[in-house]
Regions:
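C-terminal interaction appendages of subunits in large macromolecular complexes
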Residues: 1-192
Length: 192
């Protein structure tokens, strides 16, 4: 991290903003950005964290010997968590922090027959679940490769925060208190 304008811009940060860090080992954490922070060599995602934005992944479960898809939100921002199974042969294939990611799966040729590649809209394939969920099985077929394609378009909803509340008209709150609008449209209270 630096403030010299070198490297990739991660955005502007407020005091409570955090960075999302995901490693190739299937571990993630969020951290408060500091200039002295150093990152592991196997880091594959480093971006400003949006707590409402799901993380999508396809991983190989070493115990079940199958590929799984899962989508989840970071549940504990103060703790590093493993989001793939703990088996020694489990491995992360792809991870995306896009809202609507799309993946292509390339099948292994079986007995000289090549099955056609398949495109998967991960948002449609599985709902957002907990980080500890195994996920949905991707396929029973053997895979040669998993590729992350361009994500589908998505516009993040913008929260509108009202700056001023305008009260129109005159209303009596109680018999003892009377409200009126003055010349500037401001409410005046008077006790009777």
């Amino acid at each position: 991290l630096n403030v010299d304008g070198r490297g990739e811009l991660l955005g502007e940060f407020k005091p409570n903003d955090r960075l999302l860090v995901i490693n190739q080992t299937g571990k993630l954490k969020t951290i408060i950005p500091e200039l002295t922070t150093h990152f592991d060599e196997d880091m594959i995602v480093l971006e400003k964290w949006n707590p409402k934005k799901p993380i999508s992944t396809i991983y190989y479960d070493g115990e079940k010997e199958r590929y799984f898809v899962k989508r989840f939100l970071v549940e504990n921002e103060n703790k590093e968590e493993l989001f793939i199974t703990e088996h020694e042969k489990s491995q992360l294939e792809i991870v995306s922090t896009d809202w609507r990611p799309v993946a292509e799966i390339v099948f292994t040729k079986v007995k000289g027959v090549q099955k056609e590649n398949q495109t998967i809209d991960l948002e449609q394939f599985i709902a957002v679940k907990g980080i500890k969920a195994i996920g949905n099985q991707l396929t029973t077929d053997k895979l040669k490769q998993v590729n992350l394609l361009d994500s589908l378009p998505f516009e993040e909803p913008v929260e509108k925060v009202p700056e001023e509340i305008e009260v129109i008209g005159e209303e009596s709150i109680s018999e003892d208190i009377k409200t009126e609008l003055d010349d500037d449209g401001q409410i005046t209270l008077s006790l009777e």
